[in-house]
Amino acid sequence: MKFFLDTANTEDIKHFAELGLVDGVTTNPTLVSREGRDFETVIKEITQIVSGPVSAEVTATKAEEMIAQARNEIKWASNIVVKIPMTEEGLKAVKVLSGEGIKTNVTLVFSVSQGLLAAKAGATYISPFLGRLDDIGGNGIQLVKDLRQVLDTYGFKTEIIAASVRGPQHVQEAALAGADIATIPATVFGKLWSHPLTDKGLASFASDWKAFQATQK
């Protein structure tokens, strides 16, 4: 499973990229706006920190404008993936862009039919939103399982990015459900290596070693 960071904060990206465990980055207009800087500048900086895919979302709502934005965005760096919303206009754009060899990430996927349409349009990635679906009484992890089954059954190469990840449990469950990638907020990424029993075990080892050292004096 690949791990992407879901953030536009370059300091967070640098921090976690140093671990060698970050395979890519996803952004959206909300995340970029929080940085208070020019969109193009932020995206270009991110592409210089990580060599993997960096999703940059279009803001247009019409297919023609999405396509124009996408063609401009891919000029910024070779590892940019154009993020497209799951709408009828978005699907039109994905069909054209995929035909041009431009990688796309269809975002805001909440159903199997949406994911299937995106795959048929040629999307490189689809992003089902786990947390947001859970919020309305749905089951984000079940959606990932269902998407995995459909994509495999019909031979689509589209990869599943588990998005709207709320905690380590989502990451674990997405991996078990067959997601190719989890895109993870920095606050959640920093919790992945933590467990109360790990902390307890380390404290016990340290205490025992300290006691042993005292007997050697």
Curated annotation (Swiss-Prot):
Localization of this protein: Cytoplasm
Segments traversing the membrane: none
Pathway it works in: Carbohydrate degradation; pentose phosphate pathway; D-glyceraldehyde 3-phosphate and beta-D-fructose 6-phosphate from D-ribose 5-phosphate and D-xylulose 5-phosphate (non-oxidative stage): step 2/3
Enzyme Commission number: 2.2.1.2
Catalytic activity as recorded in UniProt: D-sedoheptulose 7-phosphate + D-glyceraldehyde 3-phosphate = D-erythrose 4-phosphate + beta-D-fructose 6-phosphate
GO biological process: carbohydrate metabolic process; pentose-phosphate shunt
GO molecular-function terms, A-Z: aldehyde-lyase activity; transaldolase activity
Coiled-coil region: none
HAMAP family the UniProt entry points to: Transaldolase_3b (MF_00494)
UniProt record similarity statement: Belongs to the transaldolase family. Type 3B subfamily.
Alphabetized NCBIfam families for the sequence: fsa_talC_mipB
Name by which UniProt lists this protein: Probable transaldolase
